[in-house]
């Protein structure tokens, strides 16, 4: 990805204390830095409304309570959602930056916003912000997540080569040993001939380990199995469960690792989760050293990109970038499954399905020349359908959860 005259790129960084501070500069004019401060009372109330609309549990809530609240809230009703995302746009997009971007659009140039959110803006669905009638921010620009300079410019970091026809290490809804319903299947049964099955068939010659016929719900995909495969792959494609903890490096990926595996997390019900620290520092006490990630990584799981909410924003996304990834797609909040939608969303039917199309869209984006532009294109299509029809399958509660870190 290059900052060409056809694609002017701006780096936008946010920091919060009692107020919200912005700094931005265009990559073709790095010395021209703009700084503004927005009073806290102008932004905290609408951010509180956003938190109340999202499926991430609030203090004292269970996961089911959070899902029921969110799936009966603003993101399930087009008019209420537009009111919320319009208020977010007015509160959060700096007027001066908007003017600069509009000037570029009038010249036929589509900007790229590389955005580094602050602690309190970590869950803002920037792509979905409603900036005008039938227009979201992603309508007029591409958006990606700008990793912290300490991650993207780390002297030991070496970005892995992108190999368009390279192997894809696909961990698709793995079986977690000893797991109850909280770590059960996120995709449900994948029927032969279904869109997900067709996706696996398309990747068949590149899938490792295994074949298209054995791509889903495997019980043998452990850290010791996939770690050596990732070093030579082009992509890591994970669909499953992520859980957060007290700090970012303890963010946990749930594979098929039993109690006999080694790592920094304690064994829970016969299963040892893989932490971000295991990826960065290595999971074998006898063989210290971090993993080697491929160029492109996708974590389709609950709040897999939620590390910005921590004081030290180093979690799974930063771990993947630090160990070789250039593009990492992850989620900002708890992702409702199809089963969750059918259970709690009043307008859902037994046939309501959202996650398979989402998985397929992320897969296609990560095989494209520009994952950021490709994922944003899919998000624009979903936004247009939501604006036109208001179907819950097109609600931003799923497509706006995703952001791609690029660095």
Give the ranges of each region predicted by the language model:
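Non-catalytic, solvent-exposed interaction/assembly segments
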Residues: 1-114, 118-121
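Boundary/activation segment at the start of structured domains
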Residues: 1-21, 30-31, 120-188, 393-401, ...
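A domain-level signal for caspase-like cysteine endopeptidase catalytic cores
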Residues: 56-76, 117-121, 145-250
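Helix-enriched interaction subdomains in cytosolic or periplasmic regions
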Residues: 79-80, 109-151, 246-271
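Cysteine protease catalytic core and zymogen-processing segment of caspase-like enzymes
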Residues: 221-223, 243-326
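Caspase-like cysteine protease fold
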Residues: 261-292, 334-407
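Short hydrophobic alpha-helical runs that function as membrane-insertion/retention elements
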Residues: 327-331
């Amino acid at each position: 990805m290059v900052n060409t005259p056809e694609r002017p790129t701006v780096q936008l960084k946010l920091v919060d204390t009692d107020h919200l501070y912005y700094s931005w500069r265009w990559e073709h004019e790095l010395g021209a830095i703009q700084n503004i401060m927005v009073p806290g009372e102008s932004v905290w109330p609408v951010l509180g409304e956003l938190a109340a609309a999202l499926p991430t549990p609030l203090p004292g809530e269970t996961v089911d309570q959070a899902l029921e609240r969110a799936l009966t809230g603003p993101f399930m009703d087009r008019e209420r959602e537009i009111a919320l995302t319009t208020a977010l746009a007015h509160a959060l997009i700096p007027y001066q930056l908007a003017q600069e971007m509009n000037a570029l659009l009038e010249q036929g140039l589509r900007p790229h916003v590389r955005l580094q959110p602050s602690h309190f803006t970590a869950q803002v669905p920037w792509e979905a912000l409603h900036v005008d009638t039938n227009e979201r921010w992603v309508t007029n620009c591409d958006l990606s997540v700008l990793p912290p300079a300490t991650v993207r410019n780390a002297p030991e970091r070496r970005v892995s080569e992108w190999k368009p026809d390279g192997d894809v290490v696909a961990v698709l809804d793995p079986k977690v040993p000893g797991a109850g319903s909280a770590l059960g299947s996120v995709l449900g049964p994948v029927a032969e001939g279904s869109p997900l099955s067709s996706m696996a068939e398309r990747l068949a010659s590149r899938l490792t380990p295994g074949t298209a016929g054995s791509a889903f719900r495997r019980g043998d995909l452990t850290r010791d199995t996939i770690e050596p495969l990732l070093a030579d792959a082009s992509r890591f494609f994970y669909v499953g469960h992520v859980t957060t903890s007290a700090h970012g490096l303890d963010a946990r990926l749930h594979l098929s690792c039993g109690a006999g595996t080694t790592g920094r997390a304690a064994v829970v019900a016969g299963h040892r989760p893989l932490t971000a620290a295991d990826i960065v520092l290595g999971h074998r006490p006898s063989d210290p050293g971090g993993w080697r990630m491929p160029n492109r990584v996708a974590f389709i799981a609950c709040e897999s990109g939620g590390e910005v909410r921590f004081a030290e924003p180093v979690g799974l996304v930063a771990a993947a970038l630090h160990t070789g990834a250039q593009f990492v797609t992850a989620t900002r909040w708890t992702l409702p499954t199809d089963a969750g939608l059918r259970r709690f969303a009043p307008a859902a039917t037994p046939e309501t399905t959202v996650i398979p199309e989402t998985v397929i869209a992320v897969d296609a984006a990560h095989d494209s020349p520009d994952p950021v532009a490709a994922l944003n294109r899919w998000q624009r299509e979903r936004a247009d359908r939501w604006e036109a029809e208001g179907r819950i399958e097109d609600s931003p509660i799923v497509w706006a959860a995703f952001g791609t870190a690029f660095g």
